[in-house]
Amino acid sequence: LLVKGELISDYKIHIDYPGIKVKKIHKADSPNYLFIDLIISNSTKAGIVKLKFKKEEKELIYDYKLAIKRSKNEQNEGFNSSDVVYLITPDRFANGNYSNDIIKGLKEDRIDRDDNYARHGGDLQGIADNIDYLKDMGFTSLWLNPVLINDMKEGSYHGYATTDYYTVDPRFGTMEDYLNLSTIAEKNNIKLIKDIIVNHCGLYHWWMEDLPFDDWLNFQEIYLNSTDDTIEQNTVYSNHRRSTIQDIYAAKVDYRGMLDGWFVPTMPDL
């Protein structure tokens, strides 16, 4: 578990729940994080686990939901060479719910179908509404560009600048909408491929305000010493020389440029 809270590393954690034990606690460079390794036995029942953090006389309690794990026979079959895969950028496919086109409080607050880099309004409901069309074309798998929230100032339509890894972008819909699409696809013998980006995150991910470790980002020192006005010119960009990863004779500068360089200034390389 990743736990964030003000000076949380000063607290001791206690869990009194049948089948769960704290194996190890890892402190970060920032005092506001704890990384907790848990052992959960196979017989542990689902329920609300109370995480108790104590420091002298002060105690913090957080209710953590332990959900029912899907059994092996419920796990989805992976895609393979027999599949015909259709890649969808959800924002560009179909608008099934006009009420979520603009969400108050998010940084990008416009729809403009005349602008290639603006949002166009497509969503999960739009894909679900057109499942027959996709099936009739013979596709057996749908690969969606990431649908997790991208709360960026611009260019958020593509989904590759995640700002919260646990929240569906509300402009695409809700978790219930995602599960509904999964159910509809399954009923039509269509697989749903989840795309998730862990190489980098969006510039406005919440941990960017308080990085857990001194090496959480590649070229972190350059980022910390940059401002909004200088980040673009200071960024060390990826050279995209992919062959250097396999090339035993590649120059170290080329290897690191590929491995650690940033894609763009708005997507910090993790």
Regions found by a protein language model. Name each.
Residues F93-T140, N145-L270:
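Substrate-binding/active-site clefts of carbohydrate-active enzymes
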Residues I39-K45:
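Short, surface-exposed loop/turn segments at beta-strand-coil junctions that are enriched for proline
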Residues F53-K55:
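Conserved structural position at the C-terminal beta-strand
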Residues L66-L87, R92, G96:
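Low-complexity, Pro/Ser/Thr- and charge-rich linker/hinge segments at domain boundaries
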Residues I48, E59-I68:
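Edge beta-strands of extracellular beta-sandwich domains
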Residues A28-D37:
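Aromatic sugar-binding surface patches on proteins
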Residues Y17-K24:
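Short, solvent-exposed loop/linker segments at beta-strand-coil boundaries, enriched for Pro/Gly
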Residues L1-S9, I68-R70:
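Beta-strand/beta-sandwich contexts
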